[in-house]
Amino acid sequence: MYNVIFLGAPGSGKGTQGEVVAKELKLAHMATGDLFRKAIECGDELGDTVKSYMERGELVPDEITISVVLKHLAGLKDVTGIILDGFPRSLRQAEALDEALVQQGQGIGRVIYINVPEDELVRRLSGRWVCRSCQSPYQSGCAEVTKGKCSRCQGELYQRPDDTPETVKERLKVYFSKTAPLIEYYRSKGKLSEIDGMAEISEVTKRIISAIKCGK
């Protein structure tokens, strides 16, 4: 099974690219955000804990994230490969993933890092809207924001009070402090491909697919 990791800050477009590339290469797309949303929908203690972090715009702690993701991976059947979108986000998560994959006789084939300048990330995130029910994110100007409804669950869209440029910068600072070591971790293993996230969406997709195919 060929496993690919997508790394990129919030607002880098890795979720959109993950869905498109997974469809093109016939790989399963596993977005951590979707797994969290499913946990929230369950309404149990784990889901409530995840929801509290997401509503504050904070990263869900490692141990909770690892449990949610590894449980999902263990249940996957009849897939040729997986795109891991949003996981791992720290060295602790990366090590837990490596250990779990080794136990299954697998590994990571390629790591895609979508690089977008911080000022552009701040611009994108400051214009973000979120579904009040399932936490799906949308960008200002899109059809869903115009209608005020989530296309996934028809929930109400709103802007978080802490999605201001100042607060977004602080969140990105925390994100990069955890992710920078992760990028070097995979670079040292010869697995990392860095993609310019400022290119046209279709061009970014082409470069990602090329990097994945070259890595096989």
Curated annotation (Swiss-Prot):
Main location: cytoplasm
Classification via CDD domains: ADK
GO cellular component terms given for this protein: cytoplasm
Gene Ontology MF terms in the entry: adenylate kinase activity; ATP binding; metal ion binding
PROSITE patterns: ADENYLATE_KINASE
Residue span of region NMP: 31-60
Chain segments carrying region LID: 127-163
Catalytic activity from the UniProt record: AMP + ATP = 2 ADP
Keyword Nucleotide-binding in record: yes
Residues annotated to bind AMP: 32, 37, 58-60, 86-89, 93, 160, 171
Pathway: Purine metabolism; AMP biosynthesis via salvage pathway; AMP from ADP: step 1/1
GO BP term, pick one: AMP salvage
Sequence positions that bind Zn(2+): 131, 134, 150, 153
Subunit annotation: Monomer.
Domain notes: Consists of three domains, a large central CORE domain and two small peripheral domains, NMPbind and LID, which undergo movements during catalysis. The LID domain closes over the site of phosphoryl transfer upon ATP binding. Assembling and dissambling the active center during each catalytic cycle provides an effective means to prevent ATP hydrolysis. Some bacteria have evolved a zinc-coordinating structure that stabilizes the LID domain.
Record-stated family: Belongs to the adenylate kinase family.
Protein name in the entry: Adenylate kinase
Organism: Dehalococcoides mccartyi (strain ATCC BAA-2100 / JCM 16839 / KCTC 5957 / BAV1)
Gene name, Swiss-Prot/TrEMBL: adk
